[in-house]
Amino acid sequence: MASDGDGAAAVAALGISGGGGDDWAPPLRRNLPLLAPHEVKLAKLLLSEGQSHLFEHWPEPGVDDDKKRNFFDQVCRLNSSYPGGLASYIQNARKLLADSKAGKNPYDGFSPSVPSGEVLTFGDDNFVSLEEAGVKEARHAAFVLVAGGLGERLGYKGIKVALPRETTTGKCFLQHYIESILALQEASCKLVEGECNTKIPFVIMTSDDTNALTVKLLESNSYFGMEPSQVHILKQEKVACLADNDARLALDPNDKYKIQTKPHGHGDVHALLYSSGLLEQWKSTGRKWVLFFQDTNGLLFNAIPSALGVSATKGYNVNSLAVPRKAKEAIGGITKLTHVDGRTMVINVEYNQLDPLLRATGHPDGDANCETGYSPYPGNINQLILEIGPYMEELQKTHGAISEFVNPKYTDSTKTAFKSSTRLECMMQDYPKTLPPSAKVGFTVMDAWLTYAPVKNNPEDSAKVPKGNPYHSATSGEMAIYRANSLILRKAGAQIADPVIDTFNGQEVEVWPRITWIPRWGLIFKDVKAKVHSNSSVSQRSALVINGKNITIQGLSLDGTLIVNAKDEAKFNVTGHIENKGWTIQHVDHKDTSEKEEIRIRGFKFNKVEQLELNY
């Protein structure tokens, strides 16, 4: 403990003018002898930013001293994890809260227009050549998964990446992502003359909620075949909550020595990458691209090769992956914004802001479908491809700070008080907001059936979705995988039966044959086309599982369930008529607690009556 003399020196060191000495935060002043010099500096920072209320309840020295020190440990973490420190956070909050109270529109002065980008058609010559270009570039890429969320919104208590992507094989999202990256790594290396030892880096951004469970999932599954040195875990910290319009920090209702915190959003990934030193390491080893993606879109790797091919051939510094979007659909639209002062940016504009923005800037119909039947503003699916050189240059200026927003819930129309504390938030896809007009920012559009099936809504909420709108549930997410794989095989020439319509957990969906394959088998369409011949057919009630890189399908007539396993480079041709009782689909009520959560949230399970399993 410091002496009284040290305490007096500490008081003097605070140097707060205008009400210094005994007049400011007396409870803190009495406790200054407890504090180390760096904690005194943090105290000064808090007082300078109008946060003396944090100390009003502090008792005399000797009472709760450890809790007081823990308080400053937390303040130190909050200060070090935010670009510019806690003072910047409070100042930014004050400005954004004032703008919110005044009803200021962040898009004032901006006019929207349709940005330039690429619209791809699955399976045509252009698509195939872009996929091949993307595979060639993959060895120069690094992948970043933002996975800070639990599955509570889904009705699942675990981490979202541990959720089965589909239940035919039971493989979780994280396994599929890693196997897809490894397949890209292998295919890309094969295009290099001579030896290629490239290991594609994979970063996972976690949070306090998901970190330990993510590490456990990786370690208990031997990293799903990836070398542990390829995987980097970056944990994001939460940010301080704000109690009022003056940006006074909120204390935890259950602990008066702790500042209440909440997640800052997945925009933190940029600051974490900047501070980690990984970008410099990657650039020095020849990386050109950083690919960002979110945690539960089971189709996203269908889009990666061709989109990476677009980035490489078009020279995009930023490439946002997108899907065709119906006007007013509840998904953000990628939009070019031009300010009256000449500034331009290409960013995601949320759907509830896009329509009024268009109406206010000379588009009387607002967000309307064009002759294609879709809005000209494509739907953002939160997958970004950034060119590493310009990305690093931008982060040198911003240190990874991303344009923030605040969304307080006010008690009434005066906007003077909050119903509960709020905080600043930021989104990964808002990175382009700070880019200069010279930046080459574009997008790549692909059909949603091929690339977009997020799993984010629970059964109750999904059942309320109007008919015809996407459910974005575990039910629709799994069925979308079977639909995509069936349509890919159809395009390759196989005869795949039409789906039937069924309802699970109140959601009406198409049920296609349950077809799955490992990424090494069908990484790009050219691979699939080379392995599937037109004289093969699969009935609607069938399930086909392909576990092997060099399995070909020729003259197969499947009516039932077939699982084909081939080790490593073993080659095998699947042929002939195969019929068995197969796997039937059994309805499951989402309230049936006798079933596992991951089954209940889907509303179905497979009754494995009969199957043929071939091993080579």
Swiss-Prot record:
Looking at its record, which EC class is this enzyme? Answer: transferase
Q: Which Pfam families match?
A: UDPGP
Which keywords annotate this record?
Answer: Nucleotidyltransferase, Transferase
| Reactions the enzyme catalyzes | a monosaccharide 1-phosphate + UTP + H(+) = a UDP-monosaccharide + diphosphate
Please state the Enzyme Commission number of this protein.
2.7.7.64
Keyword Transferase among record annotations: yes
Supply the InterPro entries for this chain: Nucleotide-diphossugar_trans, UDP-sugar_pyrophosphorylase, UDPGP_fam
Q: Which residues form a coiled coil?
A: none
- What GO MF annotations does this protein's record show? glucuronate-1-phosphate uridylyltransferase activity; UDP-N-acetylglucosamine diphosphorylase activity; UTP:arabinose-1-phosphate uridylyltransferase activity; UTP:galactose-1-phosphate uridylyltransferase activity; UTP:glucose-1-phosphate uridylyltransferase activity; UTP:xylose-1-phosphate uridylyltransferase activity
Q: Which SUPFAM superfamilies match?
A: Nucleotide-diphospho-sugar transferases
Mind telling me which GO cellular component terms the entry cites? cytosol; pollen tube
Q: What's one GO BP annotation on this UniProt entry?
A: UDP-D-galactose metabolic process
What cofactors does this protein use?
A: Mg(2+); Mn(2+)
Q: Does the keyword Calcium apply?
A: no
Role this protein plays? May function as the terminal enzyme of the myo-inositol oxidation (MIO) pathway. May also play a role in the salvage pathway for synthesis of nucleotide sugars.
In the record, the note on similarity to other proteins reads: Belongs to the USP family.
Its recorded name reads UDP-sugar pyrophosphorylase
> Which species is listed as the source?
Oryza sativa subsp. japonica
Gene of this entry = USP
